[in-house]
Amino acid sequence: MRKIRTKICGITTPEDALYAAHAGADALGLVFYPQSPRAIDIIKAQKIAAALPPFVSVVALFINESAQNIRRILAEVPIHIIQFHGDEDDAFCRQFDRPYIKAIRVQTASDIRNAATRFPNAQALLFDAYHPSEYGGTGHRFDWTLLAEYSGKPWVLAGGLTPENVGEAVRITGAEAVDVSGGVEASKGKKDPAKVAAFIATANRLSR
C-alpha cells in the first residue's frame, strides 16, 4: 500500500499544530527565517513541539542561515528533520547530525535531473516553484509534468498546492509526499482548519 505523506508547513501556534496533527499530518514545518511572515522564534517552537502527539515529525526550515544559529536552535528545540530552502550545498547541509531535505526551485527538467547528484546525502529532495527573489511559500506552482518520469532519490512535491489541486498534482507526478503552506491558510501564518483537513483527507484518499 502506498501512503501519500503530508507536511503542513509554516505552523506558528500550538493550536494550529495540534489541529494538523489530529487531522493526520505526518510532519509539521517550523520556519526559522526572519523575513517570512510565518517565522517563529525558539520559545514558540518549543511550545509547538511540546503540544504534539508522538510520531509527528517536526521539520525546521532554514534559508541561508549560519551554522552557529542552526546549532543553537537544534540544541533547544526537538527537531527531527532539517529542510534547507536556500543556496546551501551538500557539505553545509550534512554537518548537523540530522536527516535533511533540500528544496530545489524548479525551472527546467535539468534542475530535477541534477538534484540528486548535487545533494547525495539528502534524505529527500523537495521540488518547489522557482521565484527570482523568494525562496518558497510563494503559492506558485511549476510544470508538474516535468516529474512524471522521475524515479531518483525520494522526493516531496511543493509549490502552489491546495486542497482543490493536490489530487491532480499527485496523479500527474506520482508524488508520495506533499508539502503545503499558503494553500491551507486563512491568512499568512494562520492555518484554516477546514482547509488543512480537506488537504490531508484528499491525500489520504489517493493512498492505495
From Swiss-Prot:
Keywords: Amino-acid biosynthesis, Aromatic amino acid biosynthesis, Isomerase, Tryptophan biosynthesis. It catalyses: N-(5-phospho-beta-D-ribosyl)anthranilate = 1-(2-carboxyphenylamino)-1-deoxy-D-ribulose 5-phosphate. GO terms for molecular function: phosphoribosylanthranilate isomerase activity. GO terms for biological process: L-tryptophan biosynthetic process. It holds the Pfam family PRAI. Pathway: Amino-acid biosynthesis; L-tryptophan biosynthesis; L-tryptophan from chorismate: step 3/5. InterPro entries: Aldolase_TIM, PRAI_dom, RibuloseP-bd_barrel, TrpF_fam. The keyword Isomerase applies. Its EC number is 5.3.1.24. It is an enzyme of class 5 (isomerase). PANTHER family: N-(5'-PHOSPHORIBOSYL)ANTHRANILATE ISOMERASE (PTHR42894:SF1). Belongs to the TrpF family. This is N-(5'-phosphoribosyl)anthranilate isomerase. It comes from Neisseria gonorrhoeae (strain NCCP11945).
